[in-house]
């Protein structure tokens, strides 16, 4: 049986066929893309696994290496010293001031940005230049594990990344269980010296302090990274002081407190 098709219906059927073809093509392309949602709730998609990654914070560098993508990192920023191999990667400035010309010259196909650490206009400029930017801001243990998994997805290192993420979850759960029934130790975590800064309980570090049996003495502060002074620390009188930052380079952060022998952490050599 033959069906007669007039010109208008033929055009309509042709348009429908084209639309279906386009939809199938889009669906197929999306299916083969590497898509993940970043910590600004944006979907970031790459057609192929990233091969030239720029990490714009020391934390982003460490997490990208943890995801098994260290060999794909072509640019880092100041203080990206872990793992040690990261020190051999080209530096493109600090997390607050990127050498844009140098970064562009390295031709990254993926940039890992820090939501609250990198200036927004800096990352927006990179996006305007056509660089995909994946924003990270892990706030808890699960956030760290999830970030590793998502970075691994973008880098094509899913197997390695999943193993690290699972091990991290297991390790942190074991630590939490170990200290669960012990009395908490009032702890001051120092993230910077000038100005003197700590973290509150909403910060990842604050949560890790708690998991490890500490009680963050500045946990109730409104700001994620509050500025404080010596008087505030003396008033809080922590039993332990922990300094983050640059390893042995900031040893003086701890020796600074030795001038206060009545501070419990100093008296007990904690």
Predicted region positions:
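Bacterial N-terminal signal peptides that target proteins for export
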Residues: 2-16
């Amino acid at each position: 049986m033959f069906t007669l098709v007039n010109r208008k219906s033929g055009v309509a059927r042709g348009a429908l066929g084209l639309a279906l073809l386009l939809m199938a093509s889009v669906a197929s392309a999306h299916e083969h893309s590497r898509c993940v949602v970043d910590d600004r709730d944006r979907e970031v998609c790459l057609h192929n696994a990233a091969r030239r990654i720029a990490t714009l914070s020391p934390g982003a560098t460490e997490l990208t290496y943890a995801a098994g993508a260290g060999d794909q990192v072509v640019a880092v920023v100041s203080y990206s010293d872990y793992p040690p191999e990261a020190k051999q990667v080209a530096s493109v400035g600090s997390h607050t001031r990127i050498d844009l010309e140098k970064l562009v010259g390295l031709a990254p196909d993926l940039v890992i940005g820090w939501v609250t650490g990198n200036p927004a206009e800096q990352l927006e400029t990179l996006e305007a230049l056509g660089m995909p930017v994946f924003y990270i801001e892990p706030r808890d243990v699960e956030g760290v594990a999830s970030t590793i998994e998502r970075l691994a997805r973008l880098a094509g290192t899913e197997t390695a990344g999943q193993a690290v993420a699972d091990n991290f979850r297991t390790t942190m759960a074991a630590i939490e269980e170990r200290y669960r029934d012990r009395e908490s130790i009032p702890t001051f975590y120092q993230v910077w010296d000038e100005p003197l800064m700590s973290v509150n309980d909403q910060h990842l570090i604050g949560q890790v302090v708690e998991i490890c049996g500490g009680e963050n003495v500045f946990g109730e502060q409104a700001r994620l990274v509050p500025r404080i002074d010596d008087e505030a620390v003396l008033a809080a009188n922590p039993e332990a002081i922990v300094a983050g930052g640059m390893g042995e380079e900031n040893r003086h952060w701890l020796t600074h407190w030795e001038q206060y022998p009545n501070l419990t952490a100093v008296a007990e050599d904690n």
